[in-house]
């Protein structure tokens, strides 16, 4: 591999743009091309990064022409499996945004291809590397068992944000899009195996295909008796009351993410705010002999 990792950036949405900005700034990387379906998005990103990058509207052509050492895939989930496999076949390492694929079979196929080609596969689980979320998980692990984990991320979207959500819904539901993060967090908090999953969804608008939903919630039961709940909905009809709940309760107390700004009215569709924590609120449930809290 060369001194700089020659990387092909695929996708220029919220995450694709963030990754490209990082690659542009890091001395260890050299962007060899930007691939998007939309000419407007790739030209806008190229201009922001100072121009001069090779631009493509066809992924296969970009792979063949640039011969990258690594590919960063931040596209809609229905392209993840095929794009990752093509990158491995081209001899490149892969960074891919979550979810890895639309199905378990698709995910297993990508992992098998990575092993067969001897290339690295990295999946974008940002909360696993977020200092505040790491501490949130560590504090949850001190609360005893079982845990009750309550989380949601509803987004009241309109204009361009609702257009993005409608397009995304054609490929993935809200409950899966961010739910993969929060179920992963629940697994880390409990360090236990999920034994039962249930969920419900609803189609709250005629602006999306008849077989799609824009609201859902799921429940996960764990082997150790812990239970988790996650809710997500997108659209102009969504409530902004308690749309940013990140709360864990155990026998010894509870810990919550208290993000007053990120959880304020009018900010539910602000993607940049979704990973902000601001502060962690810890409550100790121990009672003294007089029946009052030992710690205020």
Model-derived regions: residue spans:
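Contiguous beta-strand/loop segments that form the cofactor/metal-binding neighborhood of enzyme cores
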Residues: 183-266
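N-terminal Rossmann-like dinucleotide-binding module
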Residues: 1-50
């Amino acid at each position: 591999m060369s001194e700089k990792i020659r990387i092909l950036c695929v996708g220029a949405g919220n995450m694709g743009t963030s990754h490209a900005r990082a690659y542009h700034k890091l001395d260890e990387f050299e962007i060899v091309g930007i691939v998007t379906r939309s000419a407007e998005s790739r030209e806008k990103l190229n201009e922001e990064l100072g121009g001069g990058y090779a631009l493509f509207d066809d992924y296969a052509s970009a792979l063949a022409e640039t011969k990258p050492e690594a590919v960063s895939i931040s596209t809609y989930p229905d392209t993840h499996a095929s794009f990752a496999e093509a990158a491995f076949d081209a001899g490149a390492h892969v960074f891919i945004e979550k979810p890895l694929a639309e199905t378990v079979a698709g995910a297993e196929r990508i992992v098998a291809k990575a092993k067969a080609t001897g290339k690295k596969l990295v999946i974008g689980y940002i909360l696993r590397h977020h200092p505040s979320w790491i501490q949130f998980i560590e504090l949850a692990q001190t609360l005893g068992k079982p845990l009750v984990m309550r989380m949601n991320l509803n987004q009241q979207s309109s204009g361009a944000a609702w257009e993005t959500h409608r397009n995304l819904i054609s490929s993935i539901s809200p409950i899966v899009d961010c739910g993969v993060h929060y179920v992963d967090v629940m697994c880390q908090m409990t360090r236990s195996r999920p034994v039962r999953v249930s969920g419900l969804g609803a189609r709250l608008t005629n602006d999306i295909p008849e077989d799609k939903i824009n609201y859902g919630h799921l429940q996960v039961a764990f082997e150790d008796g812990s239970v988790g709940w996650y809710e997500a909905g997108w659209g102009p009809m969504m409530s902004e009351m308690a749309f940013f709940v990140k709360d864990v309760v155990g026998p010894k107390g509870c810990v919550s993410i208290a993000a007053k700004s990120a959880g304020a009215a009018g900010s539910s569709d602000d993607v940049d705010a979704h990973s902000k924590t601001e502060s962690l609120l810890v409550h100790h449930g121990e009672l003294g002999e007089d029946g009052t809290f030992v710690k205020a």
